[in-house]
């Protein structure tokens, strides 16, 4: 974040791996502290908290600590924290969840959590449609920032 001192928008997504070993209350408390630190360093930036993404049904079955119901509980707590602290909340999970609330299997053929280039485009398109001045964000901006998915700020 310090690489972009004039950031106008900062997008944060944490949690996919941590929910397996960090309790919800501790997770949300530490997430809030992290966001507050960002706000102190970038008081004029809009800060967007992104929901934790769902996992595939096969990941959920093989690793129950990553249950999508648990992810939904963490996301509800993140939404409440974001509202209390006046941060924007983006329910990115809605762009990835299938009719059962799972990440489609083809989205993450390797580990059931992390997806490939096609789904980074889905993420990028979601962000463009759900932030202010989304027409000012382009794929060229993402490439310029060194990201294959979307601009970090």
Language model features with spans:
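Short hydrophobic alpha-helical module
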Residues: 13, 37-41, 81
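Short amphipathic alpha-helices and their capping/turn segments at secondary-structure boundaries
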Residues: 1-3, 32-41
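Catalytic His-Asp segment of secreted/periplasmic serine-dependent ester chemistry enzymes
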Residues: 54-150
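A short helix->loop->beta-strand "cap" motif at the edges of active sites that frequently abuts
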Residues: 42-46
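Charged helix-capping and loop-helix junction motifs
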Residues: 24-34, 68-74
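Hydrophobic/aromatic beta-strand patches that form the interior of the parallel beta-sheet core
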Residues: 11, 48, 88-90
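Oxyanion-hole/transition-state-stabilizing segment in secreted/luminal serine hydrolases
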Residues: 1-28, 52-58
């Amino acid at each position: 974040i310090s690489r972009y001192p004039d950031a106008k928008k900062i997008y944060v997504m944490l949690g996919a791996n941590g929910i397996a070993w960090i309790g919800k209350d501790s997770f949300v408390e530490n997430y809030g502290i992290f966001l507050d630190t960002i706000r102190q360093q970038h008081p004029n930036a809009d800060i967007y908290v992104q929901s934790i993404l769902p996992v595939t049904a096969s990941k959920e079955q093989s690793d129950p600590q990553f249950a999508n119901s648990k992810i939904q509980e963490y996301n509800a707590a993140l939404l409440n924290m974001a509202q209390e602290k006046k941060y924007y909340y983006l329910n990115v999970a809605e762009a990835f969840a299938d009719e059962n609330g799972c990440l489609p299997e083809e989205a993450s053929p390797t580990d059931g959590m992390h997806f490939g280039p096609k789904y980074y485009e889905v993420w990028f398109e979601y962000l463009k449609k759900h932030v202010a001045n989304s027409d000012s964000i382009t794929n060229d901006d993402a490439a310029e920032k060194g990201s294959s998915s979307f601009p970090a700020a």
